Amino acid sequence: MDSFLRLLIHGASGRMGQSLLRLASEDPSFQVTAAVVGNAPHRHVSDGVPFFAAAELAAVPAFDVAIDFSLPQGFSSLLALCVARAVPLVSGTTGLDSRQHEALVMAGARIPLVWGSNFSVGMAALVNLVERAGDALSGWDCDIVESHHVHKQDAPSGSALTLGEAVACKGIAPRYTSLRAGDIVGDHLVQFTGLGERIELVHRATNRDVFARGALCVARRVVGRVPGCYRVRDLIM
């Protein structure tokens, strides 16, 4: 039996994909057997890693787990491939539509699947703290302010929506503010405001590697699980 997990990285040309490739190459528990990019002219090998264009997805070699940080338009094909090959999928692709989220739930009946808007340990802890604050602060206002780099397209961010769900389930309706500026990796502020007082809970990511390390940790732990839709915090904390 191999001592490493065979890894497919989907969205390998993006910021997260590049971090994943670098960190996985430094981790002996992983071997990247395929990297999929949307704009590759044809399959090729770079630094020992086979690269495939998105159109060649069906031709990728066997893998034990896939990590996906791509765009919504490429997500459905990867999900179908993982289901067809009965392989776990870890995805951080945001901006999915309602039909794609429904497909995620259906796929969870057949494979172990993790979808998350944020794979850092700190964000997982923040979601837990926000849930606890929501229990204690009924009737308070809640505002969620997220800041990201100018190239991020979706707003509010997936992480902000996850935080909003954590308070909404406590009966508090959150309000969102999105900022796009410079090269901000990711800042999230959750503010609870009452009469004469307020509480602020903040998470700031200063390096994209925190998300890549978290995704690799989750990928390692989801292999061998029974089919189901798992939360990041189920596996990372």
UniProtKB/Swiss-Prot annotation:
Record's function text: Catalyzes the conversion of 4-hydroxy-tetrahydrodipicolinate (HTPA) to tetrahydrodipicolinate.
Membrane-crossing residue ranges in chain numbering: none
Protein's recorded name: 4-hydroxy-tetrahydrodipicolinate reductase
Localization, UniProt: Cytoplasm
The organism's place on the tree of life at top rank: Bacteria
Principal EC category: oxidoreductase
Keywords: Amino-acid biosynthesis, Cytoplasm, Diaminopimelate biosynthesis, Lysine biosynthesis, NAD, NADP, Oxidoreductase
Encoding gene, per UniProt annotation: dapB
Active site residues of this protein: 148, 152
